[in-house]
Amino acid sequence: MSELFSERIPPQSIEAEQAVLGAVFLDPAALVPASEILIPEDFYRAAHQKIFHAMLRVADRGEPVDLVTVTAELAASEQLEEIGGVSYLSELADAVPTAANVEYYARIVEEKSVLRRLIRTATSIAQDGYTREDEIDVLLDEADRKIMEVSQRKHSGAFKNIKDILVQTYDNIEMLHNRDGEITGIPTGFTELDRMTSGFQRSDLIIVAARPSVGKTAFALNIAQNVATKTNENVAIFSLEMSAQQLVMRMLCAEGNINAQNLRTGKLTPEDWGKLTMAMGSLSNAGIYIDDTPSIRVSDIRAKCRRLKQESGLGMIVIDYLQLIQGSGRSKENRQQEVSEISRSLKALARELEVPVIALSQLSRSVEQRQDKRPMMSDIRESGSIEQDADIVAFLYRDDYYNKDSENKNIIEIIIAKQRNGPVGTVQLAFIKEYNKFVNLERRFDEAQIPPGA
């Protein structure tokens, strides 16, 4: 495969590279826009890489960038003769009549650099296809990651000096101090929950676990709706259990306060039709993207979310539910190890895309054997490393689910059993089952909201 490209000259524009360097010699201020677009490795000719690097070092010391200082810098690093000597630097200084077009020239250099990296990446992918014996999904995931890195021009990965991090951290603290409210992450729309968590933080993995039919899907959908309709964030929902149409039916009920049974059967009153029209209008303007592929792999989730973030932006990911995600096949032991691998991958995804990932989880039947049915960490099915990977573990508990005579009808407890960077505790919400909707508890006493028998 490499022979295909061995006799071809890689994409490059020596003239544009010379124009960039010449513009900096002509006007040192041109280094600012040039350095915002280019790094030394973007230059094709090795001599140009060294010259641009020398310019950056001189500028970093606060010295003027000109023919004299750059010559001295290259001489000090014993690179002056390697780049062609003072005579070549003088040629560069006379290469352009004006520095006004430096950004245009830099874009040409950048474009050629991206093409070269793309060729190298494609060659590497093709070579892997011939020689690697990994699972096809592993190869596809790696290929997608490599291509995305090229398209995003990632120059990250180096060490970060703590002084730079401290400056960014101080600016962030100052911003938080000056903003209204206590929310530092993405608001869920539930007052007490947001107060306890400060909103769901970017890069966090949030596990929401409950027994079947307690309301975890409705809870996650409510959060997704609140985020998508009340903020500018887009939400990606992966539904492995229900179809996209079933999810949207639930969303319409919650958004329009429409009885779910009436909507399922089509027996809508004139008032319901009005509510449905308003709910459809609200949701159609929301940035909600649904994928209902069953038995999807984490690699597929990652690839689709990377693409969505690049094309439209992404603020949150919801997965219903974790145990239905298909393993990579690399774990030869048992399903628990596969689920552990999946949870680690979801945490890595949250960090990579800098969005909160909400993953729903089933609970084992062991919770049914206890006097107190409130869930515990050990109740998470095939838990493995889920507890370790998660930044927040939230259990949903309804007393009236187990006790039909409960005094706390329609009340659901959101038990924050783990919060890596915050307190643990319990938040109560009202659950309007007919609407598939959770509301803040202070609104529960507006009886008009809650149908009889909810």
UniProtKB/Swiss-Prot annotation:
Domain notes: Within the hexamer the N-terminal domains (NTD) form a rigid ring, while the C-terminal domains (CTD) form a looser ring; the 2 rings stack to form a double-layered ring. In a complex without DNA or bound nucleotides the central channel varies from 25-50 Angstroms in diameter. The NTD interacts with the helicase-binding domain of DnaG primase. In complex with ssDNA and an NTP analog forms a double-layered, right-handed spiral staircase with a small internal diameter; 5 of the 6 subunits bind NTP. Closely contacts 11 nucleotides of ssDNA, the 5'-end points toward the NTD staircase.
Catalytic reaction list: Couples ATP hydrolysis with the unwinding of duplex DNA at the replication fork by translocating in the 5'-3' direction. This creates two antiparallel DNA single strands (ssDNA). The leading ssDNA polymer is the template for DNA polymerase III holoenzyme which synthesizes a continuous strand; ATP + H2O = ADP + phosphate + H(+)
Protein's UniProt keywords contain Isomerase: yes
Protein name per UniProt: Replicative DNA helicase DnaB
Protein residues bound to ssDNA: R381, E382, G384
Region Linker helix, residue ranges: 163-176
Gene symbol of the encoding locus: dnaB
Record annotation: effect of changing E241A: Loss of helicase activity, reduced ATPase activity, ATPase partially activated by DnaG primase, 4-fold decreased ssDNA-binding
Domain SF4 helicase: 179-445
Keywords assigned: ATP-binding, DNA replication, DNA-binding, Helicase, Hydrolase, Isomerase, Nucleotide-binding, Primosome
Organism this protein belongs to: Geobacillus stearothermophilus (Bacillus stearothermophilus)
